[in-house]
Swiss-Prot record:
<dbReference type="InterPro" id="IPR006123">
    <property type="entry name" value="Toxin_b-grasp_Staph/Strep"/>
</dbReference>
<dbReference type="Pfam" id="PF02876">
    <property type="entry name" value="Stap_Strp_tox_C"/>
</dbReference>
<keyword id="KW-0964">Secreted</keyword>
<feature type="region of interest" description="Sialic acid-binding motif">
    <location>
        <begin position="164"/>
        <end position="180"/>
    </location>
</feature>
<dbReference type="GO" id="GO:0005576">
    <property type="term" value="C:extracellular region"/>
</dbReference>
<dbReference type="InterPro" id="IPR016091">
    <property type="entry name" value="SuperAg_toxin_C"/>
</dbReference>
<comment type="function">
    <text>Plays a role in the inhibition of the host innate immune system. Inhibits phagocytosis and killing by human neutrophils by interacting with multiple neutrophil surface glycoproteins in a sialic acid-dependent manner.</text>
</comment>
<protein>
    <recommendedName>
        <fullName>Enterotoxin-like toxin X</fullName>
    </recommendedName>
</protein>
<comment type="similarity">
    <text>Belongs to the staphylococcal/streptococcal toxin family.</text>
</comment>
Length: 203
């Protein structure tokens, strides 16, 4: 349903090139060093490359893990077969509730306010199911596409003032998955998310 996740390699490549230019005598920046200096420089090269590469690769892997999990259009027997997990203006059935997702995406200083909602049956669901459906709706607008983790939270607000916070940069915690929520008690879902300028935003 969604565009296949593909990663970019420019950050790691630029890091390696910049390190080579700064520390290697072969580029003509510094005079040729003796063997002990070259060995020291080589060790320094490897240490700095490790600092650059590990966080980047780790972040990309986590983004892909989140995308792979939340882009699935089924969860515990529930599915998006009727396209109820994306924006709709269809009249509701008696047993349905429409939950509006209200908030902002910020990309490179520009603020977007996408229009979206989800349509659910009036029933008790788990926080794991609700978390999945809400993030699925956000993925249709670009969440977890690219190489960088988003920043910010998604908040489920109930009519009695309760709140359930979903942290966009990581999966829902295991100990919260079985919390039960009646969909008819949900007021709305709010969010303030910040995307990297280097990722393509689909809003």
């Amino acid at each position: 349903m969604f565009k296949k996740y593909d990663s970019k390699n420019s950050i790691v490549l630029k890091s390696i090139l910049s390190l080579g230019i700064i520390y290697s005598g072969s580029f003509g920046i510094y005079p040729k060093a003796d063997a002990s200096t070259q060995n020291s420089s080589s060790v320094q090269d490897k240490q700095l490359q490790k600092v650059e590469e590990v966080p980047n690769n780790s972040e990309k892997a986590l983004v892909k893990k989140l995308y792979d999990r939340y882009s699935k259009d089924t969860i515990n027997g529930k599915s998006n077969k009727s396209r109820n997990w994306v924006y709709s203006e269809r009249p509701l059935n008696e047993n349905q509730v429409r939950i509006h997702l209200e908030g902002t995406y910020t990309v490179a200083g520009r603020v977007y306010t996408p229009k979206r909602n989800i349509t659910l049956n009036k029933e008790v669901v788990t926080l794991k199911e609700l978390d999945h459906i809400i993030r699925f709706a956000h993925i249709s607008y670009g969440l977890y596409m690219g190489e960088h983790l988003p920043k910010g939270n998604i908040v489920i607000n109930t009519k009695n003032g309760g709140k359930y916070t979903l942290e966009s940069h990581k999966e829902l915690q295991k100990n919260r998955e079985n919390v039960e929520i009646n969909t008819d008690d949900i007021k709305n879902v709010t969010f303030e998310l910040v995307k990297s300028v280097n990722d393509i935003e689909q809003v």
